[in-house]
Structure formats: C-alpha cells, structure tokens
Amino acid sequence: MKKKLKLIIWPIIYLVLIFNVCISFILVFRSYYYRSIFVSGSSMQPTLNLDSNKSGVVDFGLIDDHDSAIKKIKRFQIITTYYPFPDSHDYVDGFDLEKENVVDEREASYKIKRVYGLPNETIRFVVDEDEMNAALAKSTTVTEALNSEEIQYHCRQAIQFYVKAPNSEVFVKQNIKFKRRINPYKITQYQNFEYELGEGEYWVMGDNYSASSDCFNKRAPIYYQNIVGVLISIEGTCKIVSDVKIDTTVDGTKVSYKCTNKKYHFPTYY
C-alpha cells in the first residue's frame, strides 16, 4: 500500500515543482522582456480604464517595445506612442520626419491608442444617417447617450469605417468588433472624412470618440518613429499618485506619476 502511495505521490510532487518552475520562468521573462505601463485618462474607454473615475484607479499592463513587434503592427491593435502635433507641446523643436530621434521625452505627451490606418492606405469614415437619427431620437442628454448601451449600439452602427489598400481603387468596409464610446450629437463630423496616409504614417484613435485627443481630433497622422510599443496585456488595476520633482535640466518642476496599490487579475490579452 505504501509503495503504491509513493508511486502516486512522487510524480505529483515532481509535476507541481515543474509547474512552479515554469510559471516562475514565464513571470521573470515577462518582467524583463516586456515593458510595464499604466493607462492614464479615459480616451480608451470602454476597452481600458473603465473604472478610472474611481479615485484614480487605472489599468496597468505590458507592452512589447521591440522593433520586431512595432514593425508588424496590425490594424486595430492598441499601441503606445508619443504625439507629433506641435500645438500639443510634444516636441521642443517641432517634428522633423528626417530625424531618427525627434522626441524630447521631458516634453512629449505619451498616449495609448488603437491603430486604424497603416502606411500608404487611405481611410474613410461614412455615416449611416438612419442609425444616427435612431440614436438621437432616444437620447436627451450627452450623459444619457454615453451610458446607454442601446443608444451606443446605434452610434457604433452609424459610424462605418473603410480602408483602401495601396494601389487599389476599392474601399473595403472594416468589421469593428470592439466597443466604442460615441457622442451622437457629434457623429456628423465623421461623414465622408477621408485621409491618405504616406510612408511611415499611421492613423490612431481612442475608443472613446467623445473624449480622445488623437489623429481624427488633430486631422494628422502619427509616424513610425513615434511608436513606443504594442499592448500585450492588461494585468490588473492600480492607483496613480503624482511625484513632483525638481528638474535640473529645464526650468521649473517636473511632475511624474507612479503606480501604487497594484491589484492583479487574470491577464486580458490584446
């Protein structure tokens, strides 16, 4: 009987040890290979930071900032980027496409957005007026419209997205599966909006159309060299607190933020 128990117990112990070693290796690899980030703001709601209004609670996760990942970016992936728009004070000396390193990280605005258009494509938005009118008929205030799933469904159906590939004459409608947060009173601005992207240019937008500073808001693309990384996963939530420090390299003070009180959940992969 004892011999039978040993024959059963020892293999189980070995399997548990091997499992723990594998998990430890994966965790160590992830922590060193990927870069940790936290999501600030509401521009990616309802996908990210859905609870950000609750006392500074935000999502945190991992991005892949290696060139191998950035060079293979696909449509609708979520990325982190520094913005090239001069009026947002993201660059001290403006933007120069010929320079390899155009970002002054002391001044840059660090964003997380979703990729809509890839280099050399032409993107187009079209509005279905019947769906737009259905959304408007059911809403009395912007707050109600943004919080009503029924109204938001009509809003999402109203804004349709098309892409024309390089060297093609045909626009192809894209199937958008992720949810977007849209102000029905501003849908008309998307009607027949079109933009032709050049080499190394990307079109990115936040999922929260009603509160996102992005390519549509600025009517301008971002560039390959602005991209920092591709979102791999959201690992949990944390609370962000400000950390004001004296910056000896520039005049004044520098405000940075850190992620505290981390609460992990099962990773959500993107």
Feature-to-residue mapping (PLM):
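N-terminal hydrophobic targeting segments that direct proteins to the cell envelope
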Residues: 28-48
